[in-house]
Amino acid sequence: MPEALAQELAFPGGVIWQVTLDPPPAQLPAFDDRSAYLVLRDGHVRAVDHATGGTRWTAPASSTVRPASSGRHLVGADGVTAWAIDADSGREAWRRDIGSTAAAVPAISPAGAVFLTEQGDLVLLAWVDGHEVWRARMPAPVSAPVVAGPDHVFVGLDDGHLLAIRLGDGATAWTKTLGARILEMTSIGDRLFAGASDNFLYALKPKDGHLAWRWRTGGDVAGLAVADQRRVYFTSLDAMLRAVDRRHGDLRWQRPLTTRAVGGPTLAGTQIIVSGVAPELHAFRASDGGMTATAPLPGRPLHGPFLAPEHASAPLRLVLLTAGGHLLAIGQTVEPRLVPLDGLPGKKLPPEVLPVIKR
């Protein structure tokens, strides 16, 4: 999951490019370092170069869940049929029947794509050809998007249990009981952060599930967390943005938001960007939480913004989809560079000679 990039984002900056889709996409977009992927309502998937806003390719595919990208493959599912598309060319890589309708966005792991079915099965499909590596039945309804780490898949259940499933064989490595229904999880380095409906953010050690710390808020912790080397940043349904010590969980600062957050915050260098139900983004200083800028949007944001890496043809930028089908990139807008002319443009004309007027 994302940690801070070295470059600093120019915020609020301006709109680098904008694409309007009518009708809007059927699912929230997937992102990787090169593209944004949109599931269109006409049975196609479009890859948009998020440096320029241009279409890289369009492929015939539908998905009843939000897709996900590994950088090499884009994966999704149309009902019971899971599929993978080559992210570079747009060609279909494979299709597989997973036995039951896909229930959530697939998790991206080193071993393959992990799908959750409506029957409660977790299914790992290999990257190479989509064959089923293992299948594991969950003991209770899954309440949070599945998250993959280097060695485990983490599953949050409606009854408050958090499971670590081994990627190698699908067996349960450990189980931890939290205080309530698990809503969201984020795996960052040596910590697994879990938000729950008891208003706590929990920090666990991924290798054994040991509880490192927890912090109570005034509302459900329903969004992803982000972290730098010192602090963890997260929002909750009490419309607050908080920073806590990454190692010990002590509160460093908290700031009220003007609206309820949509998705989790985005960390860009020394700034934290938060989207809400209003058509705008807000930036806060990571050091003390002071709000520094606001950027207007053409519609209500549908997810937390994706931080796209700096490219030869584009600066560091935020990419997001808003209500109304507006996909846009926000960052530093660069005017064309001024260069000296080798010669004057146009055709050389002889000097005009005015007639002599006799009086």
Residue ranges and their predicted role:
Residues 8, 93, 133, 212, ...:
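Charged, low-complexity, helix-prone segments enriched in Lys/Glu/Asp/Gln
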Residues 1-10, 339-359:
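Sequence/structural signature of beta-propeller modules
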Residues 14-19, 54-59, 91-96, 131-136, ...:
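A short beta-strand motif characteristic of beta-propeller blades
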Residues 49-52, 86-89, 126-130, 166-170, ...:
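Short loop/turn segments that connect beta-strands within beta-propeller blades
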Residues 22-44, 59-83, 87, 96-123, ...:
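Repeat-blade elements of multi-bladed beta-propeller folds
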Residues 4-23:
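A short helix->beta-strand "capping" segment at the edge of beta-propeller domains
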Residues 7, 17, 280, 290, ...:
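Short loop/turn and low-complexity linker motifs enriched in small/turn-promoting residues
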